[in-house]
Amino acid sequence: SAGAPNKGLLRIDVSTPNIGWGPVETVSTNTYVCGSDTMYNFFPPPGFLCPDGSYPKRLIKQKTYNKVGNTFQNTERDAGWMVYHPSHGHIHIEGWGLYTLRLRDVTVADTLQWPVVNSGIKTSFCLIDLTTCSGSLGDCVDSVGNILNNASFPNYGLAGGYNCGNVTQGISVGRVDIYSRSLDESFVKIPYEA
């Protein structure tokens, strides 16, 4: 109802920390897709829409950095698509996350094997240096569950200054991007039967 817009929704915060050795960086290309049509070296005018009324998808590349001697070298690989998100006013990375609400089964140790009650999908996400591992304790955790802070990273802050740009986005070493529960699509619907 209009008075209870979150009724029946399990709202969630999602964090994406960079606990690696180098920046996580994406760079957009000038390759766009509208339905089954691919447009190369395309520079769409402001407000451009596909024939079906949707926004075009823009191919992105992920840059991976390596230190060779005293210089950085990088390689690029295809990494999915960006799409314009009208309620936020900028481009996001498509298909960032899938959230599932599951029924606990005490006879099954692997939680991914528990029955799915419902799911939600985050159709887009922006990569940005929103906070630090020290500023968001508990969001940066290593593979054995140790909580990491800024001092845990010898390359802390490497790169830096990423924002939600239309060409380059990223997360610096020791930084965290957080997608708040108050934003679009940050929920899983709880079925009436549950």
PLM-predicted stretches and their roles:
Residues S1-V33:
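Boundary/junction segments of secreted and surface-exposed precursor proteins
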Residues Y99-L101:
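Conserved aromatic beta-strand anchor motif in extracellular beta-sandwich/beta-rich domains
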Residues A4-G8, I91-I93, D184-I190:
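Solvent-exposed loop and beta-edge segments used for protein-protein assembly and interaction
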Residues T26-G97, G120:
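Short coil-to-beta strand junction motifs in C2/discoidin
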Residues W96-G97, T107-E193:
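Exoplasmic/lumenal beta-rich domain surfaces
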